[in-house]
Amino acid sequence: NGRLLAGQKTVYEIGIDLNTVTDPHAIAFAVSRELGLNYDQLINVIQSPPEGLSYLVLADFVDAQKALNLQELKRALQEQAATGTTGGLTGLQFKSHPQRSYPENALASNILGFVNREGKGYFGIEENYDNLLAGNAVRVLIPTDPNKAYEIPHVPDGTTMILTINRDLQAAAEDILDNALLEYGAQDGTIVIMNPKTGELLAIAVSRRMNLNNFWNYDTVYNNATEFNPAISKTYEPGSVLKILTMAAALDTNTVTPNTTYLDTGAVLIGGVTIQNWDRNPWGVQNMVGCLQHSLNVCMVNLATQMGANNFYTYMDAFGLGHLTGIDLAGESAGRLKIPGDADWYPVDLGTNSFGQGVAVTPIQMMAAVSAVANDGRMVTPHVLFGMVRDGRQYDVPAQFAGTPISAQTADTLTEMLALSLESEASLALVPGYRIAGKTGTAEIPVNGFYDISQTNASFIGWGPIDDPQFMIYVWLEKPTVSPWGAETAAPVFSEMAQKTVILLDIPPDFIRQQIASQ
């Protein structure tokens, strides 16, 4: 939204010409004092350089002001050297070169990525668009027609990227996430905010962030690459948020309607294995809204078996499970959806997969899949690039649609069902003044081959306002300790984030929008 997140600045490499140095002690003293380096180490390397070297680097990526201070000191000492009072800093050399700078330090670090000492981009935007940002000649594919490509003129200064990220919303998401980790004792967390109509990502907050200006500290912040941006890289079992997709498939195949009822006995047998509801209790006669409201596993297993494995997995594939979304950030994981015919697929998997167990997804995959429900059946491709400016011309990136897995009627029906289910239970996810659709998720984490209820992935995905969706928010808290349930942890975080979102995006409450529309 018009704020600079990554730019360019001039830094300096400071070294010495070993053939012309006259006073190594003066150089070691001046450089150590100005740059905060160890004098003894500097004098040792200057006096005992590696064999065969004529030029020795003392420091690199030195701030321009510090380099200027040393240059001025060198000039002053050269004037004194003319009188024979000092050897000066003869031999000290300065080489300028560009370095990527990040004015907001750690803000959105997981989205931006960084450029290393050699000028190569790693992670995020920096890696995915490395050729564009580095100023190399590039070819851009316009996503509205994959058969057409347009040349963008080569300009050595590189390309200015305009992102979809809303700076203030990103900062708010990071603050809310940090507070949520403390409040609920969670190990890690993620909040993603997207426009479900276009796929424009407005914020991607993760709990581990680094000051990109100090990229060399990467190893001290992260244990592995998936931790840099778990929103796109880290796979996990989503749990009950996936029930949205199972219900969508059941409605779309006319397996059920919202008013279809069944007798919930609390357990069901599939593939020789008994599956129970989350609370191990029967819930009696329920319709499909009650199925969602009470998040009944038995209901989902019944839906999947009535549809049949072929229908169920065809829909899950159409929703993109097990596939890359195509997000324009480096490091995306595809996750995995086992299907009949795979060596490790068993009949019971049809049942467990129906309520989000035994499926590996990323948060961005769930956002893409559920966008079909919020967007009249059309699934969007999440992206962070809004446009590019080159040669004074702006090239905007149009929305991409990844398919139409369900009908618009199914999407509208399910949205209303989800909204009713939240309202009926007075969910902590509700947002005053706005009707919201969404679903909680509580997925037990497998430990040594067994699921442990004390360790869960708590989540909530929701969107609104439901009559004109302008935002979709996904909250994922890993291993909350205050409560394992998504309804008690992720849901209130969603509500807080949504209330901030409608303010920052200037979305009026439902009654005001309805009054305006009726005029």
Which residues are covered by each model-predicted region?
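Short beta->alpha transition motifs characteristic of CBS
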Residues: 8-13, 19, 115, 203-209
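Flexible, solvent-exposed loop/hinge segments and secondary-structure transition points
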Residues: 10, 178-198, 206, 348
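Extracytoplasmic/secreted proteins, especially bacterial periplasmic and envelope-associated proteins
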Residues: 26, 30, 41, 57, ...
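Envelope-exposed proteins and targeting segments
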Residues: 10-14, 52-54, 90, 105-110, ...
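Small/polar-residue-rich segments within soluble enzyme cores
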Residues: 16, 26-33, 47-158, 475, ...
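Juxtamembrane extramembrane loops of integral membrane proteins
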Residues: 1-36
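Beta-lactam-recognizing serine transpeptidase/beta-lactamase-like catalytic domain environment
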Residues: 6, 142-152, 195-240, 245-479, ...
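Conserved, well-ordered alpha-helix/loop/beta-strand core segments that scaffold catalytic motifs
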Residues: 146-189
